Every structure is written in C-alpha cells, then in structure tokens.
C-alpha cells in the first residue's frame, strides 16, 4: 500500500509540474483528491487494512494529500501571476505616443457679456435681483404705468397665457417687486430672459436677454443717471468711449432718454456697424415716473429714482459685429468657437 501511495504522489507531482492553465489544475485535483479520486479511494478502503497498517497508511495518505494540495495552491498562484503579467504587457501604455487633446468648451458670448455687465454694476454697489419669467399682467404693464389700451399690450407684442398672465416682455417687473418688498434705498439690476411675439429674422427673436437697473433714494437726479450709465459704458467698451443722450419717451420714466455711444468698432469714424454715423444706440432710461413710485407705496415727494434698460443680445451683436441674432441661439460651434 505504501508503494501505491508513493506512486500516486509521484504521478500527481509530475502532472502538476507540467500544468499550463487553471483548468488542467482543476482536473488533476479531481483526479487525485476528488470524491472518486485515487487518493480518496485508498482512504475510504482503509477499513480492510490490519490494525497495524491502518495508522501508518492513514498518516502517509494524509501527508501526501496535504503535499498535493500545497503544490496545487502554489502552482495556481504562479499561473495567475503569469496571466496577469501577460495581460499587463499587452495593455502597456507607450508614454512616447503623443497625447490626445481633449476638446475644451467655451462660455457663450451672451453669458460672457452678461457676467461682465453684472461685475461692473456690482462693483458700483448694485445688487442683482431676479423674478419670475411667467408674470402677472399687473407687474408687467399696469404697475409700470402702461394702461389697459396701451399698444405694448397688443397680442402682436406679447405672449398671453390668459387675460392676467403673460410671459414677461421686459425685466422691469423685477423693479416693481423689489420696490414693494425691500427697504429703501434701492440700487439693483435685473438681468434675465424676456419674451416678445416676434417672427424670427436677422434682428428679431421671440426670446432674448435684457438687463435693467433701478436706483431709488432721496435726492436722486438725472445727473446721477448720466454719470452711472457713462461709467458703465466706459467700463464695458473702453475708457475713450464718448456718450450722448437724446430725449425719448417711456411710459415708466419721466423725463426719458436714449443713450448713444461712439461706435466701438470704428471709434466714431463711421462703419457698417454704426451705419456710417459713428454713434450706436445702446440703452434707454430716465427718472422713475412718480406714478410708478406711488404704485409701489413710495412717496414721490420724498424719494426719486432712475431706471434704465438695454438688450444684451443687441449689445453683443454690436460689440462683435454680428449681423444675425439667430447665430447666438443655433449652437453652431464654428461660430461660438470664435469667442
């Protein structure tokens, strides 16, 4: 019996020394140590041995079993290590190869311009206020001194959700809400999207960006408005920029004016951007109408204020010489990558 056990050990070790994969190891384990394996059969047949042989054969069989298990474990580790090394060698990165440049996105020119505008006004002491884009008719029109039969209320200019609710046509409602809810003095800007019932063409869009501003305090004058807007224009387009004001009419300001600036492309010489005039209209404003102050519970005999507003899209188009507003909304990377 001892010779049979030694032969089993020898054969198992020889087979394990020639193993090249995990599947073969498993088949050898089953062959010798499985339920029907050669060594298992001997252990199960020990009942037929004499009392003197049984402990000797049992001890030797268990030693051989342990020895085969250790060799199987060691061989299995070696094969796994070889497989890992082969896989790593096949996946080796050649560090001498040129890298692949990842595409870096750019911020939209509208966003860049809005952020610059906000930064300028914040540095001048303004706060940034926000409001709903779906607005009550009262805040969008009536509180701003735009009566029921005013042309601006026509369906050709406004998206009506129902008789009392509209998509805001301007960010002016934020001024009303701010005057109603905050303590005086007020110094704020209101940037955001607005909506008009316009057909899409090179200069019109049903959605665009607007920024409005409001200052209310005791002793505010038109000179304060001029100084604020002149400083903004110079910070936005260059210190050598010149501005001028022309009388105009807005229902919510009195007196009202539009501000022109020397063309920031030709610097007043005349070009296609300014249509040869050397000046570009960039915004409108004026002193807050006394009725608007009254609508917000502010005494116009004690307080005064100025308000202004401008289209951000239009200013972007003027600054960069863009002749079609649709380019700002079509997400064409060939266009946007220029900024």
From Swiss-Prot:
The gene is pheS. Keywords: Aminoacyl-tRNA synthetase, ATP-binding, Cytoplasm, Ligase, Magnesium, Metal-binding, Nucleotide-binding, Protein biosynthesis. It comes from Clostridium tetani (strain Massachusetts / E88). GO terms for molecular function: ATP binding; catalytic activity, acting on a protein; magnesium ion binding; phenylalanine-tRNA ligase activity; transferase activity; tRNA binding. It catalyses: tRNA(Phe) + L-phenylalanine + ATP = L-phenylalanyl-tRNA(Phe) + AMP + diphosphate + H(+). NCBIfam families: pheS (TIGR00468). Pfam families: Phe_tRNA-synt_N, tRNA-synt_2d. Mg(2+) binds at residue 254. Its main location: cytoplasm. This is Phenylalanine--tRNA ligase alpha subunit. It comes from the Bacteria.
